[in-house]
């Protein structure tokens, strides 16, 4: 079994760019940014429980890494960068720390490196279970209306929230809930030490208005790029700013 993905081919000899979306996104999420790099072959992946991979269920990050590894092999991707937002960034960091043959580097936008104590994990587990129950039982428009009121999305205006609620409500609530629980921050290890000892290139992007993740970025041994005029979802709020940072990283 492999993950559903859309592949776009570029010039031979350059590494692939493998894009991983955030929670409730899909393979289209990164395409406005990715298509600015037409010289590079691009793979836009649907994570388990999402988009064309909605029917794929996992028990945890190890399963996600295994599926990602098999997907890369199926497309004969031998050299690549992982580019991930939020959940996709956490998947990218986990997979990179577990080891992926051919990995050139990891570019993470607003991805959490992991909670640092049992109390934080227990609190997050309670929260994610409550959200998962709502995703399973309530209309998605109602759940996402509340989801985008969370502090991390404080930089969004009302129109942006309405647009995101409408877009994300096309998902399957049950499969979102399952993926939320399987890849909760409550079950993700703290990756700070692994990332400090890494053997791959590591870059971190965060919006200038995303105070939580700017603070987290300062804790990581990563080259950090702050995206102007953006909050947590920087590639959506300022795609040109993210394109500029990726171009600098890739020496485009």
From Swiss-Prot:
Catalyzes a proton abstraction reaction that results in 2,5-elimination of pyruvate from 2-succinyl-5-enolpyruvyl-6-hydroxy-3-cyclohexene-1-carboxylate (SEPHCHC) and the formation of 2-succinyl-6-hydroxy-2,4-cyclohexadiene-1-carboxylate (SHCHC). Gene3D superfamilies: alpha/beta hydrolase. Belongs to the AB hydrolase superfamily. MenH family. It comes from Escherichia coli O139:H28 (strain E24377A / ETEC). GO terms for molecular function: 2-succinyl-6-hydroxy-2,4-cyclohexadiene-1-carboxylate synthase activity. It catalyses: 5-enolpyruvoyl-6-hydroxy-2-succinyl-cyclohex-3-ene-1-carboxylate = (1R,6R)-6-hydroxy-2-succinyl-cyclohexa-2,4-diene-1-carboxylate + pyruvate. Pfam families: Abhydrolase_6. This is 2-succinyl-6-hydroxy-2,4-cyclohexadiene-1-carboxylate synthase. Pathway: Quinol/quinone metabolism; 1,4-dihydroxy-2-naphthoate biosynthesis; 1,4-dihydroxy-2-naphthoate from chorismate: step 3/7; Quinol/quinone metabolism; menaquinone biosynthesis. Monomer. Keywords: Lyase, Menaquinone biosynthesis. SUPFAM superfamilies: alpha/beta-Hydrolases. Its EC number is 4.2.99.20. It comes from the Bacteria. The keyword Lyase applies.
């Amino acid at each position: 079994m492999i993950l559903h993905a859309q592949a776009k081919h570029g010039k031979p000899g350059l590494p692939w760019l493998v894009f991983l979306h955030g929670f409730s996104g899909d393979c289209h999420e990164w395409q406005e940014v990715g298509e600015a790099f037409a010289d590079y072959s691009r793979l836009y992946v649907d994570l388990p429980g999402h988009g064309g991979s909605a029917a794929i269920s996992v028990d945890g990050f190890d399963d996600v890494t295994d599926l990602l590894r098999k997907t890369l092999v199926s497309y004969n991707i031998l050299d690549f960068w992982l580019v991930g937002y939020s959940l996709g960034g956490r998947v990218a960091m986990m997979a990179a720390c577990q080891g992926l043959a051919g990995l050139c580097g990891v570019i993470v936008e607003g991805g959490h490196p992991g909670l640092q104590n049992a109390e934080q994990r227990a609190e997050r587990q309670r929260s994610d279970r409550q959200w998962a129950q709502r995703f399973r039982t309530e209309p998605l428009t109602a759940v996402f209306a509340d989801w985008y009121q969370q502090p991390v999305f404080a930089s969004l205006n009302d129109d942006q929230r309405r647009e995101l609620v409408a877009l994300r409500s096309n998902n399957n609530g049950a499969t979102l809930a399952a993926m939320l629980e399987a890849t909760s921050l409550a079950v993700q290890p703290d990756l700070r030490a692994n990332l400090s000892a890494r053997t791959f290139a590591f870059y971190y992007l965060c919006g200038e208005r995303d105070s939580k993740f700017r603070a987290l970025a300062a804790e990581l041994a990563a080259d950090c790029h702050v995206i102007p005029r953006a909050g947590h979802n920087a590639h959506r709020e300022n795609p040109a700013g993210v394109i500029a940072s990726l171009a600098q990283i890739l020496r485009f």
